[in-house]
């Protein structure tokens, strides 16, 4: 069931990104891309739509190595779920850290969950709180609301000292534009 939900999330997020592209107007020579948004026909996303997770992982990998934030995030999801690749939380953690460091809210939220559950890393409520807070700052709308709820739920299991430490680390992380978030 988790794999089916993850597949749906991957496909829907890809479709939403593709639909968010506005048509170019004016002189195309003066248009500066703000971010690399995949076109609906790009191979890794088409592979996901077909349910070819192994093929998608193979296509995402070189892009992720070159720094493509969405490829890093999607590869992290595939490794965390074991879809198309052997499940490997350490590798998922690696890709989510890279994407989170580039400001990807989804990857930041995945890091929070991995720290909260101890997946690929020692369970750490302080770091989970930090990444939930950072992801909340990077998100908008309903996803922001859900992330903040998760953070607040985590806070109920923490001491005041842990929360104070987490808030200090969150501030440091945000002020450094995700460069000093206590990650290795």
Which role fits each region the language model picked out?
Residues 7-16:
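Bacterial N-terminal signal peptides
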Residues 17-54, 58:
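N-terminal leader/linker segments that initiate helical-solenoid repeat arrays
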Residues 24-31, 37, 143-184:
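Terminal, low-structured helical/coil segments at or just beyond the last alpha-helical repeat
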Residues 40-47, 59-63, 74-81, 85, ...:
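Hydrophobic face of amphipathic alpha-helices that form TPR/SEL1-like repeat modules
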Residues 49-50, 65-66, 70, 79-87, ...:
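Short coil/turn and helix-start
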